[in-house]
């Protein structure tokens, strides 16, 4: 069964891709990760004080929270317009949501990785042996459980800037749709 009018398939595809890009932003997940990083930073000690007291860390948190809020407002604008501009064409702001949303996802996972420090990198027996010996069998990885799992979303979300149309392609779409270049 055909979706949409005959010979208008590309218009339907662009509309669907715009919706996909809007969803890829995953702002709720980024906010959740930033909140988790703040919780971790309250419990993690660095230089004799809680990491959350570090001015640089707090500035990164504040910047991320501000950017997430700004993108949430942009997302509401795009969604309330049905993903289309007044002229009926797909809203190019879905590309902005995709680009900035994936950058925020990556930055939020970097924040968690930084809070975990070296405990974020899982240690395997071979690597531990190279450092001077193997742990006893079934010995847990040192540090809190969350730290050993921090690397997985960090590494996986490097791909977020590629799937759904790479961020570079999205920038080209914006250049054409918004600037007319």
Language-model region placement:
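Glycine-rich beta->alpha junctions and the first turn(s) of the following alpha-helix
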Residues: 1-71, 160, 176
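Glycine-rich phosphate/cofactor-binding loops in nucleotide/flavin-utilizing enzymes
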Residues: 2, 7-27, 119-181
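Secondary-structure capping and boundary motifs in well-ordered enzyme cores
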Residues: 5, 53, 63-67, 86-93, ...
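Tryptophan-centric aromatic hotspots in well-structured domains and transmembrane helices
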Residues: 10-13, 40, 66, 73-76, ...
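Alpha-helix N-cap and coil->helix boundary residues
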Residues: 52, 56, 73, 107, ...
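C-terminal helix-coil-helix/basic helical segment that borders enzyme active sites and/or dimer interfaces
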Residues: 69-140
